[in-house]
Amino acid sequence: DDVESRGLGDVYKRQANELLEQHHLIYLNSNLYAYQNGVYRPFGKDQINAYISKHYPFAKIRFRQEVAEQVKGAAYIDQVEETSLINVKNGLLEIGENGTVKLHPHSPDIISFRQFNANYDPLASCPVLDQALDNAFSGSSEQIELFNQIMGYLLMNHTRYQKCFFWVGLPSSAKSTFSTMVRRFCGEENVSSIELDDLGKRFGAAGIVNKTLNIVPDIKKTKLFASGLFKALVGGDAVRIEQKYREAFDYVFTGKMIFGMNLFPDFSADFEGIERRLVILKFERVYKPTDPDFNPGIDDDLSTNEAMSALLNRAISGYKSLIQNKGFLETQKSKQQMAAFVSENDSVVAWVESLDDAGILEREPISGPDGLYKAYETRCNSAGEKAKDQKDFTRIIKTRYGYETARKRINGKQYPMFIKN
């Protein structure tokens, strides 16, 4: 029996080694991946079984299971080293600190799970793409540059800038057209489409593992009661990923998130830290079928190989711009949209913005029965919102509007007051 077991063990190992050599397999986070056309892709039980069936058509279930276990053990890796190389269809791009771009051949030694659906061609251009951007952003060069930076951030295998993107515009403002183009650019297999409020559900975040992008062209109006996971994903913090019928694991998401919308989502229940993690891109143009330049085939025109290569060149330009500027451009349109978003989501800001006379902040005490906090609390109650506590109320007004606090005597009593810096 021992001889037979040893013999079978050798067969299992031989089969496992053949699989490993033929497919360059790795086993990470309870998942197998095989190297194909320059990138590691999921390699499941069905593919192992198909291989065994071809070479051992009469193999029993135990044989298949043992080979699978041998493969997992031999292919196991603990983690993947971060690389700054960008995986595209015709090689691996390296963007140097001085802005030079080099194209290296693909290699199974560079473990990469995502490949952009574009060939690098530094001379590639696409007039249809140029015109579409010009139309969508009303010819604003800074808005187009911000779009390029967002594309450049997609190329980065990290989340150091800690930003998520809201694409805001009325219906028929090309948000879906651009979303379709960006999905194709990233590669459909590298994109998820999980709604904001679904991310926090038990298995919701499992769908973003190894994705370049999570994009939803038009999110439903939703209220988020907890934003901790959202902030962790955007900020590159480790999150616990639960998978159905598999072991949970800690994961750092290096992909990016884009959400298209007509109306802002409601973060008011947990708004702390949201504003600094957002970049808002405003889509200006509303398209009508009667417009002289209306193009019903725009999605196809923006999905050609030329369009993808031209978009890659824009992304490379945006990549360099991000590094040079040490962050994203703050355009005038983005600032306006951010102010509207904050006003909708921060009850303290909304209350201050609603005041007919902002000077009242310096004339009235913060606390007390007729104080500013009481007026704010009353407004929240009438709107059916939960008021922030007085400490947070005071801190927000101080940091956002440039006030300090000091105690003053009013009618014989000491009260805290806001004073200008």
What are the roles of these predicted feature ranges?
Residues D1-Y12:
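Single conserved hydrophobic/aromatic residue that forms the stacking wall/gate
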Residues Y51, M181, K211, F225-L233, ...:
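Alpha-helical scaffold elements adjacent to nucleotide-binding pockets in ATP/GTP-utilizing enzyme cores
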Residues G204-R246:
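Conserved nucleotide-sensing/catalytic segment adjacent to the nucleotide-binding pocket
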Residues Y35, P42-T100:
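Long, basic/Gly/Ser/Thr-rich N-terminal segments
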Residues N305-S347:
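Phosphate-handling catalytic cores of nucleic-acid transaction enzymes
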Residues N210-L213, F253-M257:
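Loop/turn-to-beta-strand initiation segments
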Residues N29, I61, Q65, K72, ...:
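Positively charged interface segments
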Residues E21-D46, L92-N210, V279-L281, L312-A315, ...:
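P-loop NTPase catalytic core of nucleic-acid-dependent motor ATPases
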